């Protein structure tokens, strides 16, 4: 686990998320060409905003899976806002034809799924915390 730790000036952390979001109306518009562009764009966004995208894949042409690590100063809602907002705007600029397959000028569904990814199980954390008071 120590090799996964990230050291900053004020803290040590290992914060990882699995984020999933979909195209509005689940339209299958994410072609192989768009996927290549998206992967490059997402890496640039992550670099500019201060987080890391370890893995990014398009599923079935209509949704995204993303494995992200971030410092504690970045909330997952901010990360999703950056990823969905910037990619949506840039995709419409580069591929204006996809706008015709969607209504109201929105590429992504409003909602998203997120879960934390850790190297220690919930059970181990509970056991560790419960045993803290017993060590005195």
Language-model-detected regions and their locations in the chain:
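Basic nucleic-acid-binding interfaces
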Residues: 1-136
């Amino acid at each position: 686990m120590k090799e996964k730790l990230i050291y900053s000036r004020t803290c040590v952390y290992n914060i990882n998320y699995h984020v999933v979001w979909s195209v509005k109306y689940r339209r299958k518009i994410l072609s192989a060409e768009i996927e290549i562009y998206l992967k490059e764009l997402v890496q640039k966004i992550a670099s500019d905003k201060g987080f890391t995208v370890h893995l990014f894949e398009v599923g079935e042409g209509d949704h995204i899976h993303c494995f992200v690590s971030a410092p504690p100063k970045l909330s997952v809602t901010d990360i999703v806002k950056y990823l969905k907002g910037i990619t949506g705007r840039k995709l419409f600029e580069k591929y204006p034809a996809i706008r015709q397959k969607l209504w109201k000028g929105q590429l992504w569904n409003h909602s998203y799924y997120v879960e934390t990814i850790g190297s220690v199980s919930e059970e181990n954390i509970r056991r560790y915390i419960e045993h803290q008071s017993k060590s005195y």
